[in-house]
Curated annotation (Swiss-Prot):
Keywords for the protein's UniProt record, in alphabetical order: Ribonucleoprotein, Ribosomal protein, RNA-binding, rRNA-binding
Protein name from the UniProt record: Small ribosomal subunit protein uS5
Residue span(s) of domain S5 DRBM: 11-71
Domain comment as written in the entry: The N-terminal domain interacts with the head of the 30S subunit; the C-terminal domain interacts with the body and contacts protein S4. The interaction surface between S4 and S5 is involved in control of translational fidelity.
Coiled coil, from the record: none
Lineage: Bacteria, Bacillati, Actinomycetota, Actinomycetes, Micrococcales
Organism: Micrococcus luteus
UniProt keyword annotation of Transcription regulation present: no
Its biological purpose: With S4 and S12 plays an important role in translational accuracy.
Quaternary structure note: Part of the 30S ribosomal subunit. Contacts proteins S4 and S8.
Length: 183
């Protein structure tokens, strides 16, 4: 099933998967796994169940909006290598140079694109269950630390711990944000 992407109230919604379960005979129940983000570093994941598909998606979207969290980014990628795990699903996320794009499977791609990460390499290992992979990706993204936070924690200057290319990217991001704010 192709992922459905919609934009409501400036949020990007991606339906990762819909499952149909029959309880008794022809009584069906649907579950939906949805990722919601603003495309600028905020993302959340939700899981909804209902007797109709649209109701399940709506419940999942509401749950996803309640579980928003911030993802530190450097330019269009992540600051460092990270691994997230959930159940038997393991997701490895690696920063990539600009122009690489998102190299990831469907569930991981949905989370990263909704978070506004455009250049990253990923590898999913273990479980192929979409729920485990999405939760593993979220767990990995929650482990990310910004270069400023790492420098403050170590008691060092930012230029002592961050590569020069990363510092240039961060300066360019600040300049672009101030230009947008001034326009």
């Amino acid at each position: 099933m192709a992922p459905r992407t919609t934009r409501k109230d400036q949020f990007l919604e991606r339906v990762v998967g819909i499952n149909r379960v029959s309880k008794v005979g022809r009584r069906f129940s649907f579950t939906a796994l949805v990722v919601v983000g603003d495309g600028d570093g905020t993302v959340g994941v939700g899981y909804g169940k209902a007797k109709e598909v649209p109701a399940a998606i709506q419940k999942a979207v509401e749950e996803a909006k309640k579980s928003f969290f911030r993802v530190p980014r450097v330019g269009s990628t992540i600051p460092h290598l990270v691994q997230g795990e959930d159940a038997a699903g393991v997701v490895l996320l690696r920063p990539a140079s600009p122009g690489t794009a998102v190299i990831a499977g469907g569930p991981v791609r949905a989370v990263l694109e909704c978070a506004g990460i455009h250049d990253v390499l990923s590898k999913s290992m273990g479980s192929v269950n979409a729920i485990n992979i999405v939760r593993g990706t979220v767990e990995g993204l929650k482990k990310l630390k910004s270069p400023q936070a790492v420098a403050a924690r170590r008691g060092k200057a930012l230029d002592e711990i961050a590569p020069h290319a990363m510092l240039r990217t961060m300066e360019n991001d600040r300049a672009q944000k101030s230009a947008k704010a001034g326009a």
